[in-house]
Structure formats: structure tokens, C-alpha cells
């Protein structure tokens, strides 16, 4: 969802949002298959762009549009 850079580290950020917990927490939507896909995509991007240092983070956003969201940041999540 987002590619950012902090110092010499490129950060791939997956953002997941849920308005209710009926389907689970936002971060629970990142299945093994999704993680594998994210790792492959990040690895390919890093190789193509000669990036040595990178990580994958996750931002989980919970809440309804009419309420203040709860935002959780998972560093090096994948």
C-alpha cells in the first residue's frame, strides 16, 4: 500500500482497515499466502532498485468513520 524510506531503510507498509471485528482484527487479514506475496513483491522491488535494507510493516486501523480510529503500527511485521 505504501513505500516509505527512513534513513537507509526502505519500508513497505501494508495497511488494513476494519469497521468492526466481525471478520477479525485488521492485522488478522494478512494470511500466510498474503505474507508470501508481500515478501516476494518486496524482494523483487528491492532487487530491481538495488535496495539492500528493507522491511515490511503493517498499519492496522479499527473504527467506524464517525468515530476516532484506533491505529496500531507493527514494525518488521512480516
Residues of each region from the PLM?
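Conserved catalytic cores of phosphodiester-cleaving nucleases, focusing on short active-site segments
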Residues: 2-22, 32, 38
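Residue-level signal for pocket-adjacent positions within structured domains
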Residues: 18, 25, 69
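Mid-chain, well-packed structural core segment of small domains
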Residues: 21-52
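Domain-level recognition of nuclease-like catalytic cores that cleave nucleotide substrates
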Residues: 47-78
Amino acid at each position: 500500500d505504501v513505500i516509505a524510506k527512513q534513513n537507509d531503510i526502505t519500508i513497505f507498509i501494508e495497511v488494513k482497515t476494519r469497521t468492526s471485528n466481525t471478520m477479525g482484527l485488521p492485522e488478522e487479514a494478512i494470511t500466510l499466502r498474503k505474507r508470501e506475496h508481500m515478501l516476494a513483491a518486496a524482494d523483487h522491488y528491492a532487487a530491481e532498485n538495488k535496495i539492500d535494507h528493507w522491511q515490511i510493516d503493517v498499519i492496522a486501523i479499527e473504527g467506524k468513520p464517525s468515530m476516532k480510529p484506533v491505529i496500531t503500527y507493527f514494525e518488521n511485521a512480516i
